[in-house]
From Swiss-Prot:
The keyword rRNA processing applies. One of its GO terms (molecular function) is 3'-5'-RNA exonuclease activity. This is Ribonuclease PH. Belongs to the RNase PH family. Homohexameric ring arranged as a trimer of dimers. The keyword tRNA-binding applies. Phosphate binds at R86, G124, T125, R126. PANTHER family: EXOSOME COMPLEX COMPONENT, EXOSOME COMPLEX COMPONENT RRP41. It is an enzyme of class 2 (transferase). It comes from Erythrobacter litoralis (strain HTCC2594). Its EC number is 2.7.7.56. Keywords: Nucleotidyltransferase, RNA-binding, rRNA processing, Transferase, tRNA processing, tRNA-binding.
Length: 237
């Protein structure tokens, strides 16, 4: 039995509120259960020096957590003077994931930064960030197209992410904090609509598992991402 009482293949409720901030070109507040992440897309008509003059744009991501997003207050990374390795890993993951579904040449010589700020954490913050960042990106790019700044849509498809794990010997979908902190194994999958895998991270925590165990987690991820794709459609139509 899962602590939440959910079935093994049952996700937490997905909530999405678009246009959450008025200044960003695209924004949403996404929730996977009690995990809440504010995702904003900022369009800048400039590029990193190493990309200038190459006829393409860039999509990158940043990630942070509010000090009291978790059970106990954590110090702001700015106060510590450096980002943690976890933060750097997650924001690189966000950038890689979004670039997997963007034609950078069609984007033109501009940069879009996806800022993912965790307001409340209850497991799955990186997966909610990626899923919400795509919505913010979609809204920002649609705005550029409506303004005539981009002719052809540079977004090639939808991308979403979800966590899975083995909890009390059972493969389960969309781990919350109680499950994640006690899971025998956990995995994060980033999937493109249509079946392609953009990223897979799998770790044995308390026990190892075989190939079939990994495939069972992947099948759960496919179930979860199908639900996220539907929610993304509804949020951006």
């Amino acid at each position: 039995m899962r602590p939440s009482g959910r079935a093994p293949d049952e996700m937490r409720a997905i909530t999405i509120e678009t246009g959450y901030t008025k200044h960003a070109e695209g924004s949403c507040l996404i929730g996977f259960g009690d995990t809440k992440v504010l995702c904003t897309a900022s369009v800048e008509e400039r590029l990193p020096p190493w990309l200038r003059g190459k006829g393409q744009g860039w999509v990158t991501g940043e990630y942070s957590m509010l000090p009291r997003a978790t059970h106990t207050r954590g110090n702001r990374e700015a106060a510590r003077g450096k980002q943690s390795g976890r933060t750097q890993e997650i924001q690189r993951l966000i950038g890689r994931s979004l670039r997997a579904v963007v034609d950078l040449e069609k984007l033109g010589e501009r940069q879009i930064t996806l800022d993912c700020d965790v307001i409340q954490a209850d497991g799955g913050t990186r997966t909610a960030s990626i899923s919400g960042a795509w919505i913010a990106l979609r809204l920002a790019v649609s705005g550029l197209m409506e303004q005539g700044q981009i002719k052809d849509d540079p977004i090639t498809g939808k991308i979403a992410a979800i966590s899975c794990g083995i909890y009390n010997g059972t493969p389960v979908l969309d781990l919350d904090y109680a499950e994640d902190s006690n899971a025998d194994a956990d995995a994060n999958f980033v999937l493109i609509e249509g079946g392609k895998i953009a990223e897979a991270q799998a770790t044995a925590e308390g026990a190892t598992y075989d190939e079939e165990g990994l495939m069972r987690l992947l099948r759960l991820a496919q179930i979860g991402c199908a639900q996220i794709f539907k929610s993304q459609d509804e949020a951006t139509k």
